[in-house]
């Protein structure tokens, strides 16, 4: 029995070993296949990676080429624009190329003579015809300065003065307009204050009781008229009669004003004014009785 058991156990152990060996062989086969497949996959991956690297390397070269072309075009366009605008701004601006290769415009420094010429009204800027239009702003454009023309004043003719025996002619200026038409303006002589006083004295003399005493006349002589002033003959005054002045209701007021004026004049006494009042009252009574 023990021998059988030993043989069975020995057989069982061999079978297990075979199974294990087979299993190991299967794993080995699988692992071997995997190992064989790995180099192919690696080769394929390497090819893909190399292709991607080639593509990635080639693409930046194209972009750089395009960028260089654009830069060249921009420089050419700038040069073309500068050459086209150089005719308009050649007098005022200069084109200078910087270290970076960019074209920069700089304004020329104008001399004192050019500035003075620009300020003169007759100076015309030739570059203004080709200058670019000003930038559009909300404010209106300033109007050009209008030319100022000053007309020389016409000399006035000398006044003509003729001296007579008792009459002085005043100056009459004559102004010519447009060469054909003429206007004359005669200056009327103004009577001085002394002549006005003489006119009042004449009125007072015509009034009753307005005569001055001889002593007053000798004491205060009337001032002599200045020779330079033109002698004008006063118009003959027609004073109303004393009776009419008394009969009118406004006669008293008029007399009061005249009395005040007469009081202020030199050589006039109040007694003469009272005599005038008494005479006026007498004439009024005479009228009422009539």
Curated annotation (Swiss-Prot):
Residues 131-145 have a biased composition (Pro residues). Residues 226-235 have a biased composition (Low complexity). Coiled coil: none annotated. GO terms for cellular component: membrane. Residues 90-101 have a biased composition (Acidic residues). Residues 19-47, 55-75, 113-129, 163-184, 191-216, 271-290 have a biased composition (Basic and acidic residues). Residues 1-290 are annotated as: Disordered. Expressed in panicles. InterPro entries: Dehydrin (IPR000167), Dehydrin_CS (IPR030513). It comes from the Eukaryota. GO terms for biological process: cold acclimation; response to abscisic acid; response to water deprivation. Induction: Induced by cold stress. Induced by drought stress, salt stress and abscisic acid (ABA). Belongs to the plant dehydrin family. PANTHER family: DEHYDRIN ERD14, DEHYDRIN XERO 2-RELATED. This is Dehydrin DHN1. The lineage of its organism: Eukaryota, Viridiplantae, Streptophyta, Embryophyta, Tracheophyta. The gene is DHN1.
